[in-house]
Amino acid sequence: MRLKNIHLFLIILAILSGSAFAKEVNIYTSRHYDSDTVLYENFTNETGIKVNIISSKSKALLERLRSEGENSPADIFITVDAGNLWKAQEYGLFRKINSKKIDSIVPKNLRGKNNEWIALAKRARVLFYNPKKYSDDELKDLSYEDLSSSKWEKKLSIRSSNNLYNQSLVASMIVKHGESFTEEWAKGLVNNFARKPQGNDRAQIIAVANGEADLAIANSYYLGLMLSGKKGEKQLNAGKKVKILFPSQND
C-alpha cells in the first residue's frame, strides 16, 4: 500500500471500530498480506485497541456472517473484488457508514451507493504478452473490446468464467456497453481461446511464457509475485518472459 493508503486505512479502522473506548475490534478478512498485519499492529499501538482477526476465503466468510446473523461478533468485513461486496449487500450484511471524515477522504466513486462499503485499494485486470512476439507499439492501443476480434483467434488464455475477477470484468463491460454488446463480445472472446480455461491467473501468464497463448488476462500483481521468486523457479522464469499491458488506455 502507498503511504496515503496506509493513513487512510488506519483512520477508517479507527472510525469503524466504534466507540473510542472500545477495547477490541473484530475483523473478518479474506486478505492475507503481511502489510495488513503491520497496519493492525500500528493501529493497536496508536489506539490501545486490540485487533482480532478471522481470516478465510471471501465465500466462507460471507456464509459465516449469514449464519451468525445479528449475533455476529464481526465489526468489519474486508474482502476483495466488488462482486463479493455485491453478494454481501444481497445478503443484507452491511449497514450504512455515517462518517463525515470518511466521506471527506474517500471519493464517492469508491464508496457504496448508500455508503454501505468503502474501497481501500484497487486491483487491475490486465493483459500479459511475450515481447518477442509483439512490440509495445503494436499493442499500445489494444482495448478489452478488441479481444473479441478474429485477429486474436486461438491466441487468448484466461481462467474459468466461474472466477469472480472475470465476472467483474464482464460486469464492467455491461455497465459500459450494455448486455447485448457484451453478450456478443463474450462469444467472440470464447472463440479466441487458445485452450480450454484452466488453472489460476499465474497459469495464464505461464501459458504465454511457454508459447501456448499470445495474450493472457490476469491481475497485475501476480507478475510481481512470480518475479519475487517466492513461487519457485518455474514461475520466476515465466515472469521474466512476459510484459504487462494495461488495455483500453484511450478510453
Question: What name fits each language-model region?
Answer:
Residues M1-I6:
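Positively charged n-region of N-terminal signal peptides that target proteins for export
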Residues A22-K87:
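Early extracytoplasmic/lumenal segment of secretory-pathway proteins
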Residues V51-I53, L156, V242-I244:
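Generic structural signal for residues in well-ordered beta-strands
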Residues N26, V126-F128, K243:
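Residues embedded in well-ordered beta-strands
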Residues H7-S17:
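Bacterial N-terminal signal peptides
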